[in-house]
C-alpha cells in the first residue's frame, strides 16, 4: 500500500491484529502500483526457500484521500479498493515459472506525493499548496508504461522458457485502457484474453491486480494448466511481472 493508516505501525501489523494472526510475521512492501506483483514474487520466494508455508499478500488503497479534487488530471483516475491472495506450495509443474522486476528511481518525480515524509514534512501550508496529494506527469508516465508493460511480460516469458504464443491470459495493472491495449498488441493477445475492470474502479494502485485476479477467477476465466501473466508498473518508477501455470 501507499496509503497506510499511519506511518507506524505498518498497515500489515494493523491487519495482523485484526485477523488475530499473532504468530505471523508482518510488514509493508511499498512499490506503488507494482506492489501486488512485487508481493507475490516475494511470497513465492519465502515458499520456495522453505521459510514459510503460507503467505498472505494484500494490496489495499484509499487513494480518494490522496488526490486533489481540484486537479482533474488525477482525481478522476484513482479509486479505493483491496484484494488479497494466499500464496502456498502447488504440485510440481504449476505455479510461478518466470518473473521480472525493476525500477528507475531517476523517474520518481513523474509520479509522487511530494510532502508527508521526512524530507518535506506535512503542515498546513503544504496541504494548502496541494503537496500532500498525488502529482503526476501524465504524458511521461504514459510513455514509461507503454514501453514497460509489454517488455516486462516478455522478459518473464523468456525466463519461464515460454513462447509468446503459449500465453493464455493476461492480468495487467488497471491504470489506462490505452496502455492495456498497447501491451496486448505487443503481446499479440486479443482483448478477450486480457482482463479489464478499469471502468468499474479506476486505478486502485497496489489493489488493482489483486482485484482483477479475483474477479477473473470468479468468472471462470482460467482453467488448470493455463499460462497466465500478471504485470504492474507505478511510482518509483517501478515495474514487475510474472508468468504462472494456473493450478
Language model features: what each stretch is:
Residues 48-82:
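Flexible, glycine-rich active-site loops centered on histidine and acidic residues
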Residues 71-143, 147, 151, 233, ...:
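Condensing-enzyme catalytic core mediating Claisen C-C bond formation in acyl metabolism
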Residues 8-10, 67-71, 239-243:
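Short acidic, glycine/serine/threonine-rich loops at helix termini
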Residues 1, 30, 55-61, 79, ...:
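Short beta-strand segments
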Residues 3-5, 17-18, 22-23, 31-48, ...:
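Claisen-condensing/thiolase-fold acyl-transfer catalytic domains that form or cleave C-C bonds
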Residues 116-168, 179-187, 212, 216, ...:
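Conserved active-site "lid/cap" helical segment
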Residues 6-20, 57-63, 118-127, 179-191:
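Acidic-glycine-rich active-site phosphate/pyrophosphate-binding loop
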Amino acid at each position: 500500500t501507499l496509503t497506510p493508516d499511519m506511518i507506524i505501525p505498518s498497515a500489515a501489523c494493523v491487519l495482523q491484529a485484526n485477523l488475530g494472526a499473532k504468530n505471523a510475521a508482518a510488514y509493508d512492501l511499498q512499490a506503488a502500483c507494482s506492489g501486488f506483483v512485487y508481493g507475490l514474487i516475494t511470497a513465492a520466494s519465502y515458499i520456495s526457500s522453505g521459510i514459510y508455508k503460507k503467505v498472505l499478500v494484500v494490496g489495499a488503497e484509499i487513494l480518494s484521500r490522496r488526490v486533489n479534487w481540484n486537479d482533474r488530471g488525477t482525481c478522476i483516475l484513482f479509486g479505493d479498493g483491496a484484494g488479497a491472495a494466499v500464496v502456498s506450495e502447488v504440485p510440481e509443474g504449476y505455479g510461478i515459472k518466470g518473473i521480472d522486476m525493476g525500477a528507475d528511481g531517476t523517474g520518481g518525480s513523474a509520479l509522487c506525493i511530494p510532502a508527508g515524509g521526512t524530507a518535506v514534512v506535512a503542515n498546513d501550508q503544504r496541504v494548502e499548496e496541494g503537496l500532500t496529494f498525488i502529482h503526476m506527469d501524465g504524458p511521461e508516465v504514459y510513455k514509461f508504461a507503454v514501453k514497460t508493460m509489454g517488455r516486462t511480460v516478455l522478459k518473464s516469458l523468456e525466463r519461464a522458457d515460454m513462447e509468446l504464443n503459449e500465453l493464455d491470459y493476461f492480468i495487467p495493472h488497471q491504470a489506462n485502457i490505452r496502455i492495456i491495449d498497447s501491451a496486448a498488441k505487443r503481446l499479440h493477445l486479443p482483448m478477450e484474453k486480457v482482463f479489464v475492470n478499469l471502468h468499474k474502479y479506476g486505478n486502485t494502485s497496489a489493489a488493482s491486480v489483486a482485484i482483477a485476479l479475483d474477479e477473473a477467477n470468479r468468472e471462470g476465466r482460467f482453467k488448470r494448466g493455463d499460462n497466465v501473466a500478471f504485470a504492474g508498473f507505478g511510482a518509483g518508477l517501478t515495474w514487475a511481472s510474472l508468468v504462472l501455470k494456473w493450478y
